Amino acid sequence: MAKLHRLISAVLRLAAAGAAAAAAVIMVTSHETTSLFGIEMEAKYSYTPSFVFFVVAFAVTFAYSLLAAVLVRPGTTASRLVLLSDVTVGMLLTGAVAATGAISQVGKSGNEHAGWLPICAQVQAYCGHVMGALIAGFVSLLLYFLIIMYSLHAVAEPLCSCH
């Protein structure tokens, strides 16, 4: 049973690492230059602080997921510390996806009340990259939710006499 726990944990963590790496790489490669009324406009992820936060959060998640997949053995005392770290990473990912999603919505739809115009009609490839990064980010976040639920089960299972 311990080998099965370790295998499931490793597979979930490696999948989360892959999704996190994809999210970071897709966001980093989001770049487009266009001309609007003779004025050159450049859209790049590094111009938006929430997108930079997104890249850093998912890069950290990638590294942590790989380390945890290799080093963590479910059911050990250390797995409880890793569970705490998993929850922290889950909160980090939630913040990154939420911040990026909010800014993306403004980029797509603008904000009439603030006088902000939408930009996605002018830089469609850029906005497509950002959307792809968000999708990969949501997948990674969902996998971290599953990791947390599975880790809670693995930690609580030896404590429960109900089996």
UniProtKB/Swiss-Prot annotation:
**Which superkingdom is the protein from?**
Eukaryota
Please provide the record's keywords in A-Z order.
Cell membrane, Membrane, Transmembrane, Transmembrane helix
Q: Which GO terms describe its biological process?
A: multicellular organism growth; response to auxin; response to brassinosteroid; unidimensional cell growth
Alphabetical list of InterPro entries matching this protein: CASP/CASPL, CASP_dom, CASPL
> What spans does the record annotate as topological domain Cytoplasmic, numbered to this chain?
1-7, 72-80, 151-163
* Compartments it resides in: Cell membrane
Any one GO CC term of the record: plasma membrane
* Chain ranges passing through the membrane: 8-28, 51-71, 81-101, 130-150
- Protein topology in the membrane: Multi-pass membrane protein
Extracellular compartment segments: 29-50, 102-129
**Annotated Pfam families:** CASP_dom (PF04535)
Q: What is its main location?
A: membrane
Q: Which family does it belong to?
A: Belongs to the Casparian strip membrane proteins (CASP) family.
How does the record describe its quaternary structure? Homodimer and heterodimers.
Recorded hits in PANTHER family, A to Z, give: CASP-LIKE PROTEIN 1U1
This one is known as CASP-like protein 1C2
* UniProt source species: Zea mays
